[in-house]
């Protein structure tokens, strides 16, 4: 049941990307965009936990926010942005994929 609900939620985000977001100029301050963040969170953590992370991301995306790189956390935590132990997951200047490639060199 949760897998089908997750698929419906991802379908809703993809519909938004194709029909609404495609017709407006890009304006998201974060990388990845809020809709891509939502899809990744839903795929990684499922409908409930991924949905919570997606809503929290939308609440962070406001006109007075700094923006930046804000990846889905590696371990689920609603409070990961406020935890000193997870400071390595704060928004970075380079994407996670680039950082991993450089570490392998």
UniProtKB/Swiss-Prot annotation:
It is a peripheral membrane protein. This is Putative membrane protein insertion efficiency factor. HAMAP family: UPF0161_YidD. Could be involved in insertion of integral membrane proteins into the membrane. Pfam families: YidD (PF01809). Belongs to the UPF0161 family. It comes from Bifidobacterium longum (strain NCC 2705). One of its GO terms (cellular component) is plasma membrane. SMART domains: Haemolytic (SM01234). Its main location: membrane. It is found in: Cell membrane. Keywords: Cell membrane, Membrane.
């Amino acid at each position: 049941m949760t897998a089908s609900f997750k698929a419906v939620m991802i379908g809703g985000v993809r519909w938004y990307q194709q029909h609404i977001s495609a017709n407006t100029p890009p304006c998201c301050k974060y990388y990845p965009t809020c809709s891509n963040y939502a899809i990744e969170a839903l795929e990684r953590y499922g409908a409930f936990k991924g949905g919570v992370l997606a809503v929290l991301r939308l609440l962070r995306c406001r006109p007075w926010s700094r923006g930046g790189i804000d990846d889905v956390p590696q371990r689920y935590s609603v409070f990961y942005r406020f935890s000193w132990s997870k400071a390595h997951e704060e928004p970075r200047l380079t994407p996670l994929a680039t950082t991993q490639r450089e570490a392998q060199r």
